[in-house]
Every structure is written in structure tokens, then in C-alpha cells.
């Protein structure tokens, strides 16, 4: 597409395009082919950079868990906390590298899933505190949850100048 409007229409349609700006060839926008978003997969899933970061985080955490935790530690609350601390440290490193928004990362035991598991194996959780649910024996299962905010690339700049 030769004109800006045509490029914008292609981007809107999730087309990856290159263009020449008069000096060099550039990527119009780092989008992938995803067109339909869902509640779970919003607009961030349309961006190549965002998906690459999500894939990297998933791969790094999975590899660390497999290499350093699975089968090597007893599934105690203290050892779950060690795993949580390791993941949090990794996420803070990504914040410091400018990949994640500073101060946005959290990780901890997924209380809802842990409680559901306990109930599924016959444990009455109705009188348990949140801390007791966190510390409860979950056999060989670890239920964690995390929240992050991935920083996108600068793509649109608006500058209003008043004279």
C-alpha cells in the first residue's frame, strides 16, 4: 500500500506490511494475523511484540520450574513460597529491563483454584482462613496466579504545539 490510509486499513485487517518511507523500508505495524479477539485474548494478542513477550515468559518460567523445582522439592508451603519468590524475581528483572511496566507484576498462590482442589479431595474449607488454605497440603499440585503489564512499542505519536 502506497498511501498512509491504505496502510492503516491493512493494519486494521491484521495484515503485516512493509513500506518505503522515502529513505528506508519499515514495518508499518507489528501485527499478526489475529482478527477476532475474545474476553481472554484482547487486542494485545494482535501485536507481535506482546505475543513474543508472553511466549518468552511462559517458556522461561516453565523451563525454570522443570529444571529447578519439579521433583526436586517437597510440596510444602515454604517451598511454594520459594517458587513464588523466584518467579517474582524474574518478573522484576523484566520490569527493570523495560519489558514489563515497573511495579505491575504480582505472583502468589491461586486461592480460588487451591480451595477448589481441596474441596475436590474432600477437605471442608468453610472454616479455613485464607492463610490456612494457602498452607494446606495439595499433594503434588501447585496453584499459582500472576499478573503483569507488558509494555508495548511506541507506534503513534501525537504532538500538539502551541505558538
Predicted segment positions?
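Structured, hydrophobic secondary-structure cores that serve as assembly/anchoring elements
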Residues: 15-163
Amino acid at each position: 500500500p502506497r498511501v498512509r490510509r491504505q496502510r492503516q486499513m491493512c493494519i486494521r485487517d491484521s495484515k503485516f506490511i512493509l513500506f518505503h518511507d522515502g529513505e528506508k523500508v519499515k514495518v508499518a505495524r507489528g501485527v499478526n494475523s489475529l482478527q477476532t479477539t475474545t474476553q481472554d485474548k484482547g487486542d494485545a494478542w494482535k501485536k507481535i511484540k506482546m505475543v513474543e513477550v508472553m511466549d518468552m515468559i511462559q517458556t522461561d518460567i516453565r523451563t525454570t520450574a522443570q529444571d529447578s523445582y519439579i521433583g526436586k522439592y517437597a510440596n510444602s508451603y515454604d517451598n511454594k513460597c520459594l517458587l513464588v519468590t523466584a518467579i517474582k524475581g524474574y518478573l522484576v528483572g523484566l520490569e527493570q529491563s523495560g519489558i514489563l511496566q515497573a511495579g505491575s507484576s504480582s505472583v502468589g498462590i491461586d486461592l480460588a483454584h487451591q480451595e477448589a482442589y481441596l474441596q475436590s479431595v474432600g477437605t471442608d474449607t468453610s472454616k479455613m482462613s485464607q492463610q490456612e488454605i494457602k498452607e494446606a497440603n495439595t499433594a503434588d499440585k501447585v496453584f499459582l496466579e500472576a499478573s503483569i503489564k507488558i509494555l508495548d512499542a511506541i507506534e503513534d505519536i501525537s504532538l500538539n504545539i502551541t505558538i
